[in-house]
Every structure is written in C-alpha cells, then in structure tokens.
C-alpha cells in the first residue's frame, strides 16, 4: 500500500481513485536524498529572518 496523490485536485489518498473528483490517483515519490544540501543556506537564512 503506497500513498498516492490526485493530479487534478492535489488530495493525498491510499485509494486508486480520488474520493473528491474521481480522478485516477498516481504514486508519489519522495525527493532524492543528497548529503550535499543545495538550498540549505537559503533555508537557514529564512529561519534566521523569522526569529
């Protein structure tokens, strides 16, 4: 059983069809892990600015 997402409305589900719009849901993949964080400096700057 994998998590799926409706491409039309963006809802997440475990079913083959979206309960909201009856569109066929697709399997989602997480972003690839990399020890080199390309956007880390931007994320840290935003976090520092919010404090």
UniProtKB/Swiss-Prot annotation:
What are the record keywords, sorted? Answer: Ribonucleoprotein, Ribosome biogenesis, rRNA processing
Give start-end of the signal peptide: none
Descriptive protein name: Ribosome biogenesis protein Nop10
One GO cellular component term of this record is:
ribonucleoprotein complex
Q: Which domain of life is it from?
A: Archaea
- GO process terms (BP): pseudouridine synthesis; rRNA processing
InterPro entries under this entry?
A: H/ACA_rnp_Nop10, H/ACA_rnp_Nop10_sf, Nop10_arc-typ
Q: What does this protein do?
A: Involved in ribosome biogenesis; more specifically in 18S rRNA pseudouridylation and in cleavage of pre-rRNA.
The question of whether Transmembrane is a record keyword is answered with no
Give the species: Methanococcus maripaludis (strain C7 / ATCC BAA-1331)
* Family indicated by similarity: Belongs to the NOP10 family.
In its UniProt record, a GO molecular function of this protein is:
snoRNA binding
Residues annotated as coiled-coil are: none
The yes or no answer to whether the keyword rRNA processing is present is yes
Q: Name one Pfam family in it.
A: Nop10p
